[in-house]
A protein has these predicted regions:
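Positively charged, Gly/Ser-enriched RNA/tRNA-binding surfaces
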Residues: 3-30, 35-37, 46-141, 154-165, ...
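Short internal beta-strands
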Residues: 146-151, 206
Length: 310
């Protein structure tokens, strides 16, 4: 991959992420960071002999810095970074490789009630990616008609438990680097989670509280304003998503733009975790993480005939 193309992506992304502090991460993190926080299998992480490991996911590393800053900073913390990850697991999907560059973002703060933190920061993360797509399109990329999917991992887990499905089995079988693995597992188990909908208030009346009210709030306070600002984007709520169980703890997002040849891939993923709450031993702490596959986007969504501006 031409490094100048990757650098051009980063230049645009950092410019769009003006609300976030840009952090240059170390290539290694404390031993166990990827597993303890991110749940990444230790067999897929490169460890060193000096109690460190190579970054397999940069969002836990950003979470460590968020927690450090939150100890002395009363306000919200917003961090972003561009970093190359290394994983040891094999990839059999075209375009996926054991080492890859991600642009990631973490936002940390305190729960102030009425889903205020979730509303603000879920909206900010989605807004960033949709604005990024627009900016990249002006630079020779082709990220059209983005599909934004909002899910709730806690609700999906609850529905699976009612159906008698063990969460650990789901985590073993479903992986983000195996597109379609969630759908295949549901078919194998004979489980039918609710189909994606555009308005939970009218189409998901049977789901339990408090998740039902939370999804309705996200529709009113997050989706509707974003739809008005980004008419090219499609929004829907999905409870059939199984990727992220055990990683995220509540609301999650996934964005899939359309490429020039009509293909659609989930290039952006994110959601709320309990990492800073655990690190700071404070259940009121909140954290949302997200990332976009820089290298995959540059390979799959860039129109080669158009030059990158300097």
């Amino acid at each position: 991959m031409d490094a100048r193309i990757l650098n051009s992506f980063d230049r645009v992304a950092f410019a769009v992420a003006e609300k976030f502090d840009a952090v240059e991460l170390s290539p290694v993190s404390p031993l166990g960071t990827n597993f303890v926080l991110g749940g990444i299998d230790t067999n897929n992480v490169v460890a060193t002999v000096r109690n460190a490991e190579v970054l397999g996911d940069s969002t836990p590393a950003l979470a460590l810095e968020c927690a450090r800053r939150r100890r002395t900073h009363a306000g919200d913390v917003r961090l972003c970074s561009s970093h190359r990850m290394i994983r040891l697991q094999p990839f059999d999907f075209p375009g996926f490789t054991p080492h890859f560059r991600l642009f990631t973002m973490d936002s940390a703060g305190r729960d102030t009630g009425s889903h205020a933190f979730e509303i603000q920061h879920l909206s900010e993360h989605i807004h960033f990616y949709l604005e990024l797509f627009r900016a990249l399109n002006a630079e020779g990329f082709h990220l059209r008609l983005p599909l934004v999917e909002i899910g709730d991992v806690s609700l999906s887990e609850r529905l699976l438990a009612v159906a008698g499905v063990d969460r650990d089995k789901v985590r073993e079988a479903v992986r983000a680097h195996r597109p379609g693995s969630g759908e295949r597992l549901q078919a194998e188990l004979g489980v039918a989670l609710p189909s994606p909908v555009t308005d939970p208030r009218t189409e998901l009346r049977d789901i339990p509280e408090p998740q039902f009210s939370r999804l309705c709030t996200m529709k009113d306070r997050v989706v509707d304003p974003l739809m008005a600002k980004f008419p090219e984007a499609q929004f829907r709520f999905t409870l059939a998503r199984l990727e992220g169980l055990g990683y995220y703890t509540g609301l999650c997002l996934r964005i899939s733009p359309e490429s020039e040849d009509g293909g659609r891939f989930a290039v952006t993923d994110g959601g709320f975790t309990d990492w800073t709450a655990r690190l700071l031993q404070d259940k009121k702490e909140r954290l949302i993480t997200s990332g976009i596959g820089t290298e995959f986007v540059c390979r799959r969504y860039r129109a080669e005939s158009k030059p990158i501006s300097k």
